[in-house]
Amino acid sequence: IRDQPRSRGLGDVYKRQTIDGPSGVGKGTLAFSLAEKLGWNVLDSGLLYRLIGFLSLKEKLETPHEIIICINNSKIKLLTNLKKRICEIELDDKVLGKELRNEDVASKASEFAKNSEIRNAIMKIQRNAYEKEKGLIADGRDMGTVIFPEAVLKVFLQASSEVRAERRANQLKEKGMSVIMHDLLRQIQQRDKEDINRKISPLKPADGSLLIDTSNLSIKEVEKRVMENYKKL
């Protein structure tokens, strides 16, 4: 673990923390633990890309241009449900739930997430999320490097691919699904390679990030470390 150096005081600035890292390191769990402690909102950046996937299928949109027009003509509101520990999206006054959480939507989301025009459109929504409300914990892969470079605290979580594969396997088993560890590990390693080497917003720690390896840490231990650094600000 490497501590982030002492920064300027918060003053009246809008409070933002970012949590970046690959899949399976505990970003979402940490985000909600911190949000509950601080009374802040949570931004799940991946959910917005799932919205893109959902819209492309629902409206039969095929090009980034069509999707961006659809986004601009839609009423999109981001919601934090601390009780359920989930982020939700309200689209044209309807809260979307399971509609965003299926493999077809995820596949489309991954496809369009590689497009720079789509990412710029999503960034505008992310930047304005909860803008005039309480503080924000932003969970993603480029939150500290691209979306909120001014964040008062930037956290980058990491863990070995073997540990992350084991965590994912346990999640799937809890849902009654069969698991092939070799395949899970290969998928995680392939995703890491793609995230790190992509041309647009590659996965990497932001300058001055608090780096934490969660391989052998509990969520409480990670939360304690982050809060210690936050209190130094």
Locate the predicted segments by residue.
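Single conserved hydrophobic/aromatic residue that forms the stacking wall/gate
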Residues: I1-Y14
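Hydrophobic anchor at the beta1->P-loop junction of P-loop NTPases
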Residues: I19
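P-loop (Walker A) phosphate-binding loop of NTP-binding proteins
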Residues: P22
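ATP-binding Walker
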Residues: V25
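Walker A/P-loop
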Residues: G28
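N-terminal phosphate/diphosphate-binding loop that engages ATP/GTP or pyrophosphate donors
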Residues: E36-E103
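NTP-dependent small-molecule kinase module
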Residues: E90-L100, A106, A169-E174, K193-L233
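ATP-dependent NMP and nucleoside kinases share a basic, alpha-helical "lid"
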Residues: G97-A113, E117-K175
